[in-house]
Design a protein with these regions (language model features):
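Catalytic domains of carbohydrate-active enzymes that cleave complex glycans
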Residues: 372-401
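Fungal secretory targeting signals
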Residues: 1-20
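Short linear/disordered segments characteristic of secreted peptide precursors
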Residues: 8, 361, 376-379
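Cleaved targeting-peptide boundary
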Residues: 19-27
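Active-site mouth of glycoside hydrolases
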Residues: 26-275, 279-289, 293, 297-301, ...
Length: 401
């Protein structure tokens, strides 16, 4: 593992070199009722989940580069980041939802490896991703915590462990004590402090804090938050309101997304929440329509930030495109080439990996990608194309803008 001082110095030097390239300036995204606006015109947030932009556990880097063998984590190569941004542009996407741009804790390579300690070197890949996203005109939606721990790790169990609760996802997912994450004053204060450290970090490429940079259009409480019973949506309204106020105080121009796993009716009246969401495994058109009806009644917006499936895909897209409440959606999840090797693609173990342009893709997979692109262009740009429209070629390496 490299000394943190060397990593931080290398990141600073790269940022100085990039400073000669003017940063793109995107307009903020605002909300009026159930409509998102950019410069007064309706805007839709369509794109993929690309969780690994800040930290990844799928690639072993070259010898000598930062790597944690316990969690198999490393920082993604800059070329991988620009490659996936160019891919999102080719897909017609307008945004990316990326977990590790906001969830980075409890791991030796993370922003907060231990309580209260900030690892500045971990911001290097995050800074680059945010900067390049702005240059590519791709906005970002960023969750702040995860209901699960994962391999990296990154979940609420990290804060529980730091506060002295010996709880693990494997053994304690149904233990009522996990609700301490939402109710324990010490944990809530620690999480609020963590949020502040993320949002007030200044990106050397843009000279803006994450709170200021309009490339990040929304922060989300977290990913698939719930309580000890699967599907209970037991993410207390008081906690959601508290986190929303923290984000709005630090970043008043950001939209705030309720990341509860499902649309919780008790949250609909929270003034600071702009957007509600749900995840759909498998794709469920009846559930989708019920969620849209709930959110419409509250005069808020809805985004489907996580969905994957094959059945009813076209019907699912059709409902969202016709809805006056749906402001976007994202599929799980996009991986690209393993730069600097343009001839190989990065794999992930969950069975939902989508690789644009992989020669090994089946005809079925490529047609699914075509349907996603058709949907993104229709919903995000109002452009209609044929379901079998040729997929644009993404050059490799994609340029750093």
């Amino acid at each position: 593992m490299w000394p943190l001082q060397i990593l931080a110095a290398a990141a600073a030097a790269a940022a100085v070199a990039a400073a000669s390239r003017p940063a793109a300036v995107l307009s903020p995204v605002t909300r009026t009722g159930s409509t998102l606006l950019v410069d007064g015109k309706p805007w839709k947030a369509v794109g993929p989940n690309v969780y690994w932009l800040g930290l990844d556990e799928n690639v072993v880097p070259p010898e000598g580069e930062p790597y944690d063998p316990v969690t198999k984590s490393s920082y993604p190569a800059k070329g991988r980041i620009t490659d996936v941004l160019a891919t999102v542009r080719a897909l017609g996407g307008t945004m990316i939802r990326s977990h590790t741009l906001g969830i980075s804790l409890g791991n030796p390579l993370s922003v907060m490896p231990v309580p209260g300690v900030v690892n500045d070197a971990a911001f290097a890949s995050i800074d680059w991703a945010v900067y390049q996203a702005g240059q590519y005109g791709i906005r970002l939606m960023i969750p702040l915590i995860d209901n699960f721990i994962g391999l990296l790790p990154w979940g609420k169990y990290t804060f529980l462990r730091w506060a002295g609760f010996n709880l693990t996802q494997g053994a304690d997912a149904t233990n009522p004590e996990i609700q301490q994450f939402y109710t324990n004053a010490t944990i809530v204060a620690a999480f609020n402090d963590y949020i502040a450290k993320i949002l007030t970090h200044q990106n050397p490429y843009t000279n803006q804090t994450y709170a200021e940079d309009p490339t990040i259009f929304a922060y989300e409480t977290g990913n698939e938050l719930l309580g000890p019973v699967w599907g209970d949506m037991d993410c207390p309204a008081d906690w959601v309101a508290d986190i929303a106020r923290v984000v709005k105080r630090l970043a008043p121009q950001k939209l705030f997304v309720d990341g509860t796993y499902g649309v919780n009716k008790t949250h609909l009246a929270i003034d600071e929440v702009d957007v509600f969401s749900n995840h759909y495994y498998p794709v469920d058109t009846a559930k989708l329509q019920a969620d849209l009806d709930l959110v419409e009644g509250a005069g808020k917006a809805w985004v489907g930030p996580d969905a994957n499936g094959t059945k009813n895909m076209t019907a699912f897209f059709d409902i969202m495109e016709k809805s006056t409440v749906a402001v976007g959606d994202a599929f799980w999840s996009l991986f690209g080439r393993n730069l600097p090797d343009c001839g190989s693609f990065v794999d992930h173990s969950d069975g939902f990996t989508l690789q644009y342009g992989n020669p090994a893709n089946s005809e079925y997979t490529n047609h699914r990608i075509q349907l996603i692109r058709k949907h993104f262009l229709a919903m995000g740009q109002g452009t209609q194309i044929a379901p079998d429209d040729d997929l644009p070629v993404v050059p490799c390496p994609a340029p750093a803008l």
